[in-house]
Structure formats: C-alpha cells, structure tokens
A protein has these predicted regions:
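Conserved structural scaffold segments of CAZyme catalytic domains across common CAZy folds
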Residues: 1-97
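Aromatic- and carboxylate-enriched substrate-binding clefts and catalytic-loop regions
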Residues: 66-171
Length: 171
C-alpha cells in the first residue's frame, strides 16, 4: 500500500510545477461546521468554537462555509465583504492566536462575476487567509477547464490554496 501515491509517476508524467516557491502550500485537516452537523451558523461564537476545535486537535485550518459573505449566487453578492454579523478581523486574529488558519467558501458564479476573484484574492492574502473552497461549478466543458486554470494561477499569485468542491475529473 502507498506505492503508487509515493511514486514519482505524477512528477514524471507532467511538466514541472509552474509555481516556483511552493513552501506556502501545506495540506492539512480542517474543522468545518457544515461537516459536523450539516448546519451552518454564521455566528461569531460558533466560528470561534470550530477554531478552538481545530486548535485542540492540532488541525491547521478552519473553513468558514457558505453565507459568510451574505447572499450568494445573486448579483448583489460581494465576496469581499463579510456578512454584517461577522467581524472578520476578529475571526482572523482569534484563529492566528490559536495557530489556525482560515479557509473561505465561495460560490463559483460569485467568484466569476466581473472577475471579482482578482480583487478578492488580493484581499484574502492581505487578511492572511490560507485558502478558498469554490463550489458549484456544475460543468466540465473547455470554458470551465480554462476557468479552473485562471483561478489557480491568480490564487497562486496570492499564495492561496484552492479546493474546487465538486470539480470535474482532472485532466
């Protein structure tokens, strides 16, 4: 067991990584409120509880799931502005003090609308966000293949890890 995953086949069959410095890419376990209960509560005390859980377990990450930026998949959705009940600077400070980094959930159409991701990714880097989880791509045509690559390239510039949730099979 483990022979395939530990082999050099992926590196051998693919071009070299286009990202020169990959030290910031650190996989790890993540606390996540929706994972536990199927319920998402965008409340400061609940988010802090999951940050505390991640810290107690030695997990490096906590994901703030859907609704963190209010209405999603709507023209008025703004992936740079947290919902009014969330104090993002406080969340990030609290997490950092406990050795936990934050991931943020995003709806794909909100990311794509007017290339919102370009400004948002720079902001997330400034905030100290570790990564983003993009959801509901719901297609696998060439447009989407190219979109994934644009997102990855922009995220890498801002040292953001990316989880494409429900993604098409990789090429």
């Amino acid at each position: 067991p483990g022979q395939f995953i530990e082999s050099e086949i992926i590196r051998t069959l693919n071009p070299p990584c286009a990202i020169e410095d990959t030290e910031w890419i650190k996989p790890g376990l993540c606390a996540w409120d929706h994972w536990w209960s199927g319920e998402v509560k965008m409340e400061m005390d609940v988010i802090k509880e999951y940050i505390d859980l991640a810290s107690a377990q030695g997990w490096p990450y906590m994901l703030i799931d859907w609704q963190w930026y209010g209405p999603y998949n709507e023209a008025k959705a703004d992936i740079t502005k947290p919902a009014p009940q969330l104090d993002m600077p406080e969340i990030l400070r609290y997490a950092k003090e406990r050795g936990v980094r934050i991931w943020l959930w995003l709806y794909s159409s909100d990311v794509n609308r007017n290339d919102a991701y370009k400004e948002a990714f720079r902001l997330y880097q400034k905030w100290g966000v570790a990564g983003i989880k993009i959801d509901f791509m719901d297609r696998q045509d060439q447009y989407m293949v190219n979109w994934y690559r644009r997102i990855i390239e922009e995220a890498a510039k801002c040292q953001l890890m990316v989880n494409f949730h429900g993604a098409y099979k990789p090429d």
